[in-house]
Amino acid sequence: MAKEFSRSQRVSQEMQKEIALILQREIKDPRVGMATVSGIELSRDLAYAKVFVTFLNVLTDNADPDTVKNGIKALQDASGYIRTLLGKAMRLRIVPELTFAYDNSLIEGMRMSNLVTNVIKNDVERQVNPGSDEEK
């Protein structure tokens, strides 16, 4: 029976769960806020991991880009501690070196959804009032 997923995919899924728990329970830095792990890119040799995070406070507050930069900086500063806790939780021979990156796909998805909603709303308005657009 062939393996459905490679080892690096299985490890990255487990690592995503563990890092999410660590961020939720262990990291007390206020700059991090409510960070969620949206994905992990793991190298084939499991030596490097790029952790993609989103910040829920950025989604709700329309926060400035400095909030994101400060959050990523705080996570990068705590990466050694997170790596230590990850090593204890997962019992890997080699714990990957962690780098954190902001994942803006959720915000972009919301922006695209709003654009589509506005276009549909404008289209419905044009169908109801067909002559009002030509006068403008």
From Swiss-Prot:
Q: What gene does this protein come from? A: rbfA
* UniProt keyword list: Cytoplasm, Ribosome biogenesis
Assigned GO CC terms: cytosol
Q: What PANTHER family does the annotation carry?
A: RIBOSOME-BINDING FACTOR A, CHLOROPLASTIC-RELATED
Return the Gene3D superfamilies for the record.
3.30.300.20
Please give the superkingdom of this protein's source: Bacteria
The protein's name in its UniProt record? Ribosome-binding factor A
Compartments, record wording? Cytoplasm
Looking up NCBIfam families in the UniProt record yields:
rbfA
Q: Name one GO biological process term.
A: maturation of SSU-rRNA
